[in-house]
Amino acid sequence: MNEKKDYKDTLNMPQTNFEMQAGLTRKEAQFRQRWLDNKLYHKILAKNKNNKQFVVHDGPPYANGSIHIGHALNKILKDIVVRFKSLQGFYSPFVPGWDTHGLPIENKMLSELKVNHKQIEVVKLRKEAAKYALNQMLIQKEQFLKLQMLSDFEEIYLTLDKNFEAKQLKLFKKMFFDGLIYKGLKPVYWSPSSMSALAEAEVEYYDHVSPSIYTCFTITKGNEFVEVDDELLIWTTTPWTLIANSGVAVGLDIEYSKVKFNKKNYIVASDLLEKVMEIFGVQKYKVVDTFKGKNLLGVEYQRPIKTDLFGIVVAGYHVSIDAGTGLVHMAPLFGEDDFIIGQENELDQIMHINDDGSINSEGDEFQGLFYSSANIKIKEFLEKNDKVMFFEYFTHSYPHDWRTKKPIIFRGTPQWFVSIDKIKPAILKEIEKIEGRPSWAVKRLATMIENRKTWTISRQRSWGVPIPIFYNEKNEIVNDEKVFDHVIELVEKYGSDVWFEKSVDELLPSEYKNKNWTKETNIMDVWFDSGSTSIGVEIEGVSVPFDLYLEGIDQYRGWFNSSIINSVAYWGQSPYRLLLSHGFVLDGKGKKMSKQLGNVVDPQEIIQKYGADILRLWVANCEYAHDVSVSESIIKQTVENYRKIRNTIKFLLGNLQDYDHSKFNLKLEGIHELINERLKKVKFDILQAYNDYDFNDVIKTLTNFLTDLSSFYLSISKDSLYADKINSKERRMIQYNMYNILEATLVVIAPIMPTTAEDAYDNFNKQDKQESVHLEKMFEATIADDKLEKTWKEFFDLKDEVYKEIEVEIANKKIKRTNDAHVTINTKSNFLMSLDLKKLLMIGKISFGSSLRVETFDSHKCPRCWNHIEKTEVVEDLCQRCYQTINS
């Protein structure tokens, strides 16, 4: 019995040290350390130092707790941009930052020290808060580095840094002396749970159950339209504010009805009469008279709670007939419209709510109650006086403190404000120059700025940058630049703690001491801190505006907003040229993540289990302009996509071990020329997608190309790669294409999967090889020639027809695979007849005839290359090609 000869050693089998198993969790740590040891980030900056800049400015995450999946999405997107721009040759330094002041850290310290803010010295609290914030920053820094960021995080910025704080005070000073910052009494968002004012960006809306009460105020001084003892019908969802009532607003041109029921006359807007009567359950009523709102002006009534005082009817521009009664109860310190109208009409301003939400002595018998707890007691009080027309509870969207998640109120207090109205035209003009993605980004920002009148920047807390204001002996604000400059110098030297550590005289220049001045105790809003980064952050060789701000969609009312206000105020221009936003990260079912639901996906767990490159590929695959989903199954799907890319890279590397690109001097022919043109088109499309920040399209274009490549070109190439002579023309043309494809693939994936790209690059016998793939240059776009694609369409149409027929024969078990087939083709095409169709279609035998036909090929299988040949062509059991190859 003859032994079968083993021809394996005569074949050109793939060889590479690039492993099939990625081992990302192990390799990522190794490569990260190598990059840090070799100072790769600094080498990239040095290489591009004199080139055009592209700077992504990092919006500072809050230094509290581990990073979550939203942080990972954000930082990876930024890193992809920075890496891509660096490969393009841009000088693209990335300086990460942290937001380090604010209530969450302050509350954390109070909780750990088991005290409230009144039981601890401010200086001690601040020292502990700083220590905590710095520790949290270090934790997050390590977690960010594990995302395989390009930056080495050596150069960072912190809002608690004394240099940053000093620059923030310089901004405050400029805005103050430009008349943009002022102190005033005004109702603002007030959080009883935080005992501080809030800015709009710190307010979130959740469903909340509130009381709805219809009551009436008895007229004590009428006119020709209404009489004493007639009743003004009022609707409110904040009964606790009735304590502070001092007026009722009507619409000047709204028609009102005097309607009689239950032996009394009631005043209500005519358009709301039927609805109100239906709510009250009143079926029989009589309209006694109708008149305009202007006819009610000056009418006096008995106040609902402080019954010994009277209120007055005034004109209200905000009164509508959408709901309620058309008469609006006014408590001037508990609503913006109430405040403005109250000032115009000199209405009493009553503040009966303490900082913590409890009622003070102004609340008479309700003193000591929490404001919301007083609602039911006030209802009972009104019922005793027969003043409750209707009462119920209803659920509606209501503002909450974004940190404590507790309801907030409008409350008039002395606060420091930025006047947006004064600077609004300049901001809107700058917004017109900004490019935004998605396309609605700029309009959204402009709308939010247009709708802002003021920005409350003072906070009644301890952990933050102080408002550097002194008051003289008459309690007047001191307007002296020299005083400001002296404080700024002290902060630059000692940090903002100096404001709390030193006495007033110690903070003042010598000529201002001993004047019995006092200092402001409020601190600045953290959004003023983070909004100051275009002033406070210095990057070598970089000036405002930065090229890109990239943050979550919530930052249109947050960082995007505060940054452009502060930058226009200080620099006179926008801090960014391009605005990019991403959505929120939801679970696999599209639900918001929460610990209660148990659907939180931890980026650290993904990295530990699969590797950062997998997490980064998931990010690149997301259509991030919208909300995105992540789950175990989505990550596993990403792993599969990753494997396909990795396997193709491994195949390319394995078959280039004997190829020297510098020695290639052949002209591409046939299918090889077509593949080269296809690569040009793919590179063009990928470059366009990268430049459009469409990373999903980058991955889609690359994977589609590699998939098509594997299913056709690489499949038909295996025969030549493995079985041809090493230096055969066919083999070298294939390797030329494979080299170019691999070279392009590695720079394409480098911004997205930096570890995998570097791992493959280490194993790539590349011409003019750099120390790292990340020091390579991104290819430039060239337009492909579509003439070849049109020419070759005829072949691919034929291929589809042939394979359709072959599949039928395989299903009928007449043949096992394509090279078992003898295919007869009906064609008169010179192009098709000029091709090596047997090779291109991987068919056993090709004939030309009158119709397309597939038959079994009565053949001999070459034991070396496994191709099927005519029995008459066998030479010592081999096909002629294999015989010549091993005997040459």
From Swiss-Prot:
Electron transport found in the keyword field: no
Residue positions binding L-isoleucyl-5'-AMP: 551
Top-level lineage group: Bacteria
Stored InterPro entries: aa-tRNA-synth_I_CS, aa-tRNA-synth_Ia, Anticodon_Ile_BEm, Ile-tRNA-ligase, Ile-tRNA-ligase_type1, Ile-tRNA_ligase, M/V/L/I-tRNA-synth_anticd-bd, Rossmann-like_a/b/a_fold
Gene Ontology terms describing biological process: isoleucyl-tRNA aminoacylation
Positions of disulphide bridges: none
Gene Ontology MF terms in the entry: aminoacyl-tRNA deacylase activity; ATP binding; isoleucine-tRNA ligase activity; tRNA binding; zinc ion binding
GO cellular component: cytosol
Chain sites annotated for binding Zn(2+): 862, 865, 879, 882
Keywords linked to the UniProt accession: Aminoacyl-tRNA synthetase, ATP-binding, Cytoplasm, Ligase, Metal-binding, Nucleotide-binding, Protein biosynthesis, Zinc
Residue ranges annotated as motif 'HIGH' region: 61-71
Catalytic activity reported: tRNA(Ile) + L-isoleucine + ATP = L-isoleucyl-tRNA(Ile) + AMP + diphosphate
Family affiliation: Belongs to the class-I aminoacyl-tRNA synthetase family. IleS type 1 subfamily.
PANTHER family, per database record: ISOLEUCINE--TRNA LIGASE, MITOCHONDRIAL, SOLEUCYL-TRNA SYNTHETASE
Identification of the protein by name: Isoleucine--tRNA ligase
Native source organism of the sequence: Mycoplasmopsis pulmonis (strain UAB CTIP)
